[in-house]
Amino acid sequence: MQLARGTVGGRGCALFPLLSILVVQGARIVLSLEISADAHVRGYVGEKIKLKCTFKSSSDVTDKLTIDWTYRPPSSSRTESIFHYQSFQYPTTAGTFRDRISWAGNVYKGDASISISNPTLKDNGTFSCAVKNPPDVYHNIPLTELTVTERGFGTMLSSVALLSILVFVPSAVVVILLLVRMGRKATGVQKRSRSGYKKSSIEVSDDTDQEDSNDCMTRLCVRCAECLDSDYEEEAY
């Protein structure tokens, strides 16, 4: 009898490590869903804000996957459901976020992000993103602290300055290059005139053609004037 008890006790001791390994592996399988989100997000009144949330699951995405976003105002323990997803998007139709929450993710890429349109100062608070993808249902729930502020004069000024740099600097560079080129050309002409530079046959021909053209224009103007005078005299008689 004592020998039998010792044998059973030995088997129990031998099975304990095996059971421990199975429990640990099972826990790893259940807890393999990981969710990540920005801890702090800053936005401006009236400008759309994106709240990013990504997840990694060991299981394939199916129609059983669910996503839930909640909101908690500052200095409050009350939470408000603002978005639900299961094969389709279901943004809230009540409360302060009514008609302002839109889907900005892709579950097949592990993206569970949403966007807030026309944010106000009243939207400040804490947002949470919860994802369940059976059998992966246990996971961490990351929190995102949203801070909405008015755009200050400094921010607007920086935007104007950036626009000025992008528009006016290239134009200024082009103008400077043209002025430098014109200056070099004028300097070259002065040096040639001082050193007794003689024009080539092509340059002389161009000047001659220009003079002939000017003479022709002068003659044409004189001829037109004579015709007008003759017509005037005939009408007088």
Swiss-Prot record:
PROSITE patterns to which the protein is assigned, alphabetical: IG_LIKE
Keyword set includes Nucleotidyltransferase: no
Glycosylation sites: 124
Residue stretches making up the Ig-like V-type domain: 33-149
Gene designation: Mpzl3
Disease / disorder: Defects in Mpzl3 are the cause of rough coat (rc) phenotype, an autosomal-recessive mutation, arose spontaneously in C57BL/6J mice. Rc mice develop severe skin and hair abnormalities, including cyclic and progressive hair loss and sebaceous gland hypertrophy.
Ranges facing Cytoplasmic side: 181-237
Organism (species): Mus musculus (Mouse)
Keyword field: Cell adhesion, Disease variant, Disulfide bond, Glycoprotein, Immunoglobulin domain, Membrane, Signal, Transmembrane, Transmembrane helix
Membrane topology, record value: Single-pass type I membrane protein
One GO cellular component, as annotated: membrane
InterPro entries: Ig-like_dom (IPR007110), Ig-like_dom_sf (IPR036179), Ig-like_fold (IPR013783), Ig_sub (IPR003599), Ig_V-set (IPR013106), Myelin_P0-rel (IPR000920)
Tissue specificity statement from the Swiss-Prot or TrEMBL entry: Present in all tissues tested, including the skin. Present in the keratinocytes and sebocytes in the skin (at protein level).
Signal peptide interval: 1-32
SUPFAM superfamilies in the cross-refs: Immunoglobulin
Compartments (UniProt record): Membrane
Name recorded for this polypeptide: Myelin protein zero-like protein 3
KW Thylakoid (keyword) present: no
Purpose: Mediates homophilic cell-cell adhesion.
Regions that span the bilayer: 160-180
Residue intervals on the Extracellular side: 33-159
Cysteine disulfide partners in this protein: 53-129
